[in-house]
Amino acid sequence: MTDAHESTSPQRAAEVLAQRWQHAWNAHDMQSAGELLAPDADFVNVGGRWLRGRSEFVDYHVRLHEMQMRNSTWSDLALTVRELSADVALAHLEWQIEGDRDPDGRRREPRRGVFTWVLATDGHGAVIAAAHNTNHMPAPTPTPNPAPARAS
């Protein structure tokens, strides 16, 4: 895996992409965020919407940042990377967002989630070939199963 200008480890390539993602998000520059994706990338957002390709990603996120995400701040929290082959790695990025709003305009509480990225080299460096984003959800509280009734 390589960065745009140098040969580097998958871990470092993912760190650079995560830093660039955070910077682009916080600048609300979705064109720059889109440049981190392969032109034919698959991107599934936290709501399950499947965006196909860089241009669909950019179009959707430009609109989102004009409305709900206009005042949002993204923070990278943790990153793990596993090299799958010389040109492919799997990354998980834990994040937090503050300052975004619901579609009706109500301010949301800060929230966390996990991004899953498939990273690939494209001849110019590492890019996000596929991404799936999800919000952390509270774990369900386990309830004990009642003991089965005994036959008499």
Model-derived features: positions:
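A beta-strand edge to alpha-helix "cap/lid" segment located at domain peripheries
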Residues: T2-L17, Q22-S32, D42-S152
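Helix-loop segments that flank and shape redox-cofactor active sites
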Residues: P39
